[in-house]
Protein backbone atom coordinates (compact mmCIF):
# COMPACT_ATOMS: atom_id res chain seq x y z
CA UNK A 1 0.00 0.00 0.00
CA UNK A 2 2.82 2.38 0.88
CA UNK A 3 4.55 1.54 -2.39
CA UNK A 4 1.55 2.86 -4.32
CA UNK A 5 1.77 6.20 -2.51
CA UNK A 6 5.51 6.29 -3.15
CA UNK A 7 4.91 5.88 -6.88
CA UNK A 8 2.36 8.70 -6.81
CA UNK A 9 4.84 10.88 -4.91
CA UNK A 10 7.62 10.13 -7.38
CA UNK A 11 5.28 10.93 -10.26
CA UNK A 12 4.26 14.24 -8.67
CA UNK A 13 7.88 15.24 -8.06
CA UNK A 14 8.78 14.38 -11.65
CA UNK A 15 5.72 16.21 -13.01
CA UNK A 16 6.55 19.35 -11.04
CA UNK A 17 10.29 19.31 -11.68
CA UNK A 18 10.05 18.56 -15.41
CA UNK A 19 8.85 22.08 -16.38
CA UNK A 20 10.59 23.89 -13.52
CA UNK A 21 14.15 22.72 -14.24
CA UNK A 22 14.31 24.27 -17.76
CA UNK A 23 12.79 27.50 -16.45
CA UNK A 24 15.36 27.79 -13.67
CA UNK A 25 18.22 26.93 -16.03
CA UNK A 26 17.03 29.50 -18.56
CA UNK A 27 16.81 32.14 -15.84
CA UNK A 28 20.43 31.61 -14.81
CA UNK A 29 21.90 31.08 -18.29
CA UNK A 30 20.24 33.97 -20.13
CA UNK A 31 22.03 37.22 -20.95
CA UNK A 32 21.44 39.78 -18.22
CA UNK A 33 21.41 42.99 -20.30
CA UNK A 34 18.67 43.46 -22.90
CA UNK A 35 19.79 45.18 -26.07
CA UNK A 36 17.65 47.65 -28.06
CA UNK A 37 17.39 45.04 -30.79
CA UNK A 38 15.77 42.58 -28.39
CA UNK A 39 13.17 45.10 -27.23
CA UNK A 40 12.10 46.03 -30.77
CA UNK A 41 9.24 44.41 -32.64
CA UNK A 42 10.28 41.86 -35.26
CA UNK A 43 8.94 42.77 -38.71
CA UNK A 44 10.20 40.15 -41.17
CA UNK A 45 13.84 41.12 -40.76
CA UNK A 46 13.26 44.77 -41.66
CA UNK A 47 13.88 47.75 -39.45
CA UNK A 48 10.99 48.57 -37.17
CA UNK A 49 8.83 51.38 -38.50
CA UNK A 50 7.00 53.55 -35.97
CA UNK A 51 6.43 52.78 -32.33
CA UNK A 52 7.33 49.34 -31.11
CA UNK A 53 4.39 49.03 -28.74
CA UNK A 54 1.15 48.59 -30.65
CA UNK A 55 -2.17 49.18 -28.92
CA UNK A 56 -4.98 46.76 -29.63
CA UNK A 57 -8.64 47.57 -29.32
CA UNK A 58 -10.39 46.07 -26.34
CA UNK A 59 -13.02 44.81 -28.78
CA UNK A 60 -10.71 41.99 -29.89
CA UNK A 61 -10.44 40.77 -26.32
CA UNK A 62 -14.21 40.91 -25.87
CA UNK A 63 -14.65 38.73 -28.95
CA UNK A 64 -12.04 36.30 -27.69
CA UNK A 65 -13.65 36.17 -24.26
CA UNK A 66 -17.10 35.57 -25.74
CA UNK A 67 -15.69 32.82 -27.96
CA UNK A 68 -14.01 31.08 -25.03
CA UNK A 69 -17.15 31.27 -22.90
CA UNK A 70 -19.44 29.85 -25.57
CA UNK A 71 -16.86 27.27 -26.62
CA UNK A 72 -16.67 25.95 -23.07
CA UNK A 73 -20.46 25.85 -22.91
CA UNK A 74 -20.52 23.65 -26.01
CA UNK A 75 -18.08 21.31 -24.28
CA UNK A 76 -20.52 21.13 -21.35
CA UNK A 77 -23.32 20.20 -23.75
CA UNK A 78 -21.43 17.27 -25.27
CA UNK A 79 -21.99 14.79 -22.37
CA UNK A 80 -25.68 15.65 -22.39
CA UNK A 81 -25.89 14.95 -26.12
CA UNK A 82 -24.12 11.61 -25.70
CA UNK A 83 -26.43 10.49 -22.87
CA UNK A 84 -29.59 12.03 -24.35
CA UNK A 85 -31.65 8.82 -24.21
CA UNK A 86 -30.58 7.95 -20.66
CA UNK A 87 -31.20 11.29 -18.92
CA UNK A 88 -34.94 11.45 -19.52
CA UNK A 89 -37.20 14.41 -18.92
CA UNK A 90 -35.10 15.84 -16.06
CA UNK A 91 -32.03 16.00 -18.31
CA UNK A 92 -34.03 17.67 -21.06
CA UNK A 93 -35.33 20.33 -18.66
CA UNK A 94 -31.85 20.94 -17.22
CA UNK A 95 -30.31 21.28 -20.69
CA UNK A 96 -33.11 23.61 -21.79
CA UNK A 97 -32.53 25.86 -18.78
CA UNK A 98 -28.80 25.79 -19.49
CA UNK A 99 -29.35 26.78 -23.13
CA UNK A 100 -31.78 29.54 -22.12
CA UNK A 101 -29.13 30.99 -19.79
CA UNK A 102 -26.63 30.88 -22.66
CA UNK A 103 -29.08 32.63 -24.93
CA UNK A 104 -29.74 35.27 -22.27
CA UNK A 105 -25.99 35.91 -22.02
CA UNK A 106 -25.75 36.25 -25.79
CA UNK A 107 -28.65 38.71 -25.84
CA UNK A 108 -27.02 40.71 -23.05
CA UNK A 109 -23.75 40.95 -24.99
CA UNK A 110 -25.63 41.93 -28.12
CA UNK A 111 -27.61 44.69 -26.40
CA UNK A 112 -24.54 46.08 -24.66
CA UNK A 113 -22.81 46.37 -28.03
CA UNK A 114 -20.05 43.88 -27.28
CA UNK A 115 -20.61 42.21 -30.64
CA UNK A 116 -20.32 45.41 -32.68
CA UNK A 117 -17.08 45.38 -34.65
CA UNK A 118 -16.61 49.10 -35.25
From Swiss-Prot:
The chain crosses the membrane at residues 8-28, 64-84, 87-107. GO terms for cellular component: NADH dehydrogenase complex; plasma membrane. It is found in: Cell membrane. Its main location: membrane. Keywords: Cell membrane, Membrane, NAD, Quinone, Translocase, Transmembrane, Transmembrane helix, Transport, Ubiquinone. One of its GO terms (molecular function) is NADH:ubiquinone reductase (non-electrogenic) activity. NDH-1 shuttles electrons from NADH, via FMN and iron-sulfur (Fe-S) centers, to quinones in the respiratory chain. The immediate electron acceptor for the enzyme in this species is believed to be ubiquinone. Couples the redox reaction to proton translocation (for every two electrons transferred, four hydrogen ions are translocated across the cytoplasmic membrane), and thus conserves the redox energy in a proton gradient. Belongs to the complex I subunit 3 family. This is NADH-quinone oxidoreductase subunit A. The lineage of its organism: Bacteria, Bacillati, Chloroflexota, Chloroflexia, Chloroflexales. The gene is nuoA.
